[in-house]
């Protein structure tokens, strides 16, 4: 990632002035010269069970699965580790995120927050907006999430201790539930999935 982009990203997180160096982010492990992430293109029939911050592969491995840059050119053949995110499911944009993404999350553990900061930094630096608009996410309240978690646990899809937080564990459990029911296993709670989970 260019220095200006790193500065902008860290500035958005740390509320630094433009002339200051992003020392706070560097202290958290920010790697100069490495971007936070980028939008990518996925092949038809991609196995969405491979998405989520808990699953990391190097760029060579992602390329072997058919992941490409947005212009369909191959990913750079390096051993840089990345995770694949589809924050609004298979119908929305997909992003490969690198270690610097986790640095942004050091300030706020919400994936949506870190993604917003990274995308804002890209736009300020002259980058393009995501190719597809995010799909609207249903508003889920804590009792609904607890109900979903209880349902998943009771049916053999481990969502962890029911806490009402729609985090990566719950999303992974929904992905397994979707796969078992012949659905696209992207972990995204569409109205149809919520109906099956009894949490409309």
Show where each model-derived region lies.
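Extracytoplasmic and endomembrane cell-envelope/extracellular-matrix remodeling and assembly machinery
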Residues: 2-3, 7-150, 154-157
């Amino acid at each position: 990632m260019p220095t200006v982009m790193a500065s902008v990203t860290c500035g958005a997180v740390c509320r630094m002035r433009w002339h200051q160096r992003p020392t706070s982010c560097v202290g958290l492990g920010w790697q100069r010269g490495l971007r936070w992430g980028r939008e990518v293109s996925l092949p038809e029939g991609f196995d969405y069970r491979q998405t989520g911050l808990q699953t990391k592969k190097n760029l060579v491995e992602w390329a072997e699965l058919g992941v490409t840059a947005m212009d369909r050119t191959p990913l750079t053949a390096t051993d840089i580790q990345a995770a694949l995110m589809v924050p609004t499911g298979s119908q929305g944009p997909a992003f490969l995120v690198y270690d610097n993404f986790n640095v942004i999350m050091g300030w706020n553990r919400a994936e949506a927050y870190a993604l917003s900061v990274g995308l804002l930094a890209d736009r300020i630096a002259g980058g393009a907006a995501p190719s597809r608009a995010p799909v609207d996410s249903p508003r889920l309240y804590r009792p609904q999430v607890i109900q979903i978690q209880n349902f998943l646990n009771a049916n053999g899809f481990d969502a962890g201790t029911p806490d009402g937080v729609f985090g990566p564990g719950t999303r992974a459990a929904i992905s397994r539930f979707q796969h078992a029911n012949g659905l696209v296993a992207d972990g995204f709670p569409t109205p149809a999935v919520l109906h099956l989970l009894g949490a409309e």
